Amino acid sequence: MNFWYSRSKIAYLLLPFSLLFWLISTIRRFLFQSGILSAYKAPVPVIVVGNLSVGGNGKTPVVIWLVQQLQMRGLNCGVISRGYGSQSEVYPLLVNAETDPVRGGDEPVLIAKRAGVPVCISPNRQQAIELLLSSYPCDVIVSDDGLQHYKLQRDIEIVVMDAVRGLGNGWVLPAGPLRELPSRLADADFIIGNGGENVYTDTAMRLVPHYAINLVTNEKRELNAFEQAIAIAGIGNPDRFFKMLQDEGIRLVSSQAFQDHQKFSADLFARFAPNVPLLMTEKDAVKCGRFAQQNWWYVPVDAEITGEKSAALLDKIEQMTQQGK
């Protein structure tokens, strides 16, 4: 919402509701931190990857990057997620690359596919962890989102933020885009700026596209082979995806932004010209395989996070798994 990024009249009108939201969330956090309400402590280290603001910060690529980096160090990882948008009949649910994204959720299926890691979804994070640990030998649990889920104790907090949009107008919902006040960042262990750095971040992340993959044939094609294309995106920040394609020299005949976690059907794509290549995100592609056309392609991206601080973070996690808790 545009008014989240300025202190407009609409934002001021919503400010009383934001004060109520802040009061409730602050009391709730205090109750868990003081021990008045009990929080679950897992028998292995728990790393939470989340964000302070809503929508499109690049959290999922960071989860995939983190899991892959820890796997390279010989650690067995498990991922838990609330499974937003999933329609499973039962929770907790173990998710793999072949799970129907309608049941498992688009992001959990994508993580399982890209990282080859066991994923468990449930609104109850404790149940998700317990099922993972009883099913797989996990050395560490990575929580996809859940920064504000204080029922779960965590060993490390990683916050991902859009370095361009920042924290918007600095107000909490609904007057602003924040779930908690900016001062909450002081408690985070590591802050990643998607697209650059700012005063809050420890390091920057680039989302790097390498090629496009055909949804039907799995053919890989360099992005510079696409002179023009139609682009669609059902993610938190679709404009970032469209700009990335344009930066690669692709002329967009048209672009269509859908809601985050959009449920796709063949009918939604009937409007697009069949003779023009259609490019989509990998997150969207996991939901389109059953009705994909020959000229549909998805563009996987890799999170590029470097520097001494990111290496120190990985060292710290590895040491936790060796020393116990």
UniProtKB/Swiss-Prot annotation:
Coiled coil: none annotated. The keyword Chloroplast does not apply. Signal peptide: none annotated. One of its GO terms (biological process) is lipopolysaccharide core region biosynthetic process. It comes from the Bacteria. Keywords: ATP-binding, Kinase, Lipid A biosynthesis, Lipid biosynthesis, Lipid metabolism, Nucleotide-binding, Transferase. It catalyses: a lipid A disaccharide + ATP = a lipid IVA + ADP + H(+). Pathway: Glycolipid biosynthesis; lipid IV(A) biosynthesis; lipid IV(A) from (3R)-3-hydroxytetradecanoyl-[acyl-carrier-protein] and UDP-N-acetyl-alpha-D-glucosamine: step 6/6. GO terms for molecular function: ATP binding; tetraacyldisaccharide 4'-kinase activity. Transfers the gamma-phosphate of ATP to the 4'-position of a tetraacyldisaccharide 1-phosphate intermediate (termed DS-1-P) to form tetraacyldisaccharide 1,4'-bis-phosphate (lipid IVA). This is Tetraacyldisaccharide 4'-kinase. The gene is lpxK.
